C-alpha cells in the first residue's frame, strides 16, 4: 500500500497485534526509504515500550483512546486479565510523545458514546472521569498537557492526513473550519472545562461562514451554583445514553 502512495490506518488492541503492525511499517519504511508515510494505529490499548519507540522512529501515528483511561466499569476487568504491570500500559499518551511519536485522539463512536471536545481534553489532562467520583487511572504518568491534548484533536489530526498546510491551526491561508466554545481549554479551571461538556458549542464556522450560533448562556450566581450541583446527575445520564443528552 505504501509503495502505491496509500496510507494504512490499522485498528489494534493488544500488544501482539500492535507489534505486528509496527513490524510491517518498519519493513515498509526500510523498503521504500520513506520515513514520512504517517501510517496510523488506533485504539493501541496495550503497547510495549519497545514498540512505542518504533512508533517514533518510523513515524507511526498513535491514535490513542485515552478517554477510556479512567477506571470506569467498562475497563474494570483489564488488570485481572493482563496483570498490574501490563495494565499500566493501558491507553498510553504521554509515553508515545516521549518516544517521539505524534498522538491523535479519537472517540470510537458509535461503539462508544459520542464524546465531545471538553470530555476529550478533560480525560487527556486528568485521566479521570469528569463530574462523577471514580477511581483515577492506574497510569497518571500518561497525562497530557492541555496544549498537547488540544493538538491531539486539531493540528496533529491534520498532520496525520498530510493536510497540515490546509487545516489544523488558525493561520492565514488555511481553511476557516472551526468550533467555538465558551471555555478556555488552556487557562480555565478544569471543573469549568468539565461542566462545559454538557453545553453546546457557541458557534460552528465552515469556510469562514457561521453555520451555527447558540444563544449566550446567562445566569445568576445562584443559578450557576444550582447547575453545578446538578451536573454529576446530568453527566451520568449523558454517559449512559449512546446518543448523548
Please name every model-derived segment:
Residues 1-90, 98, 104, 182:
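Active-site core of metal-dependent hydrolases
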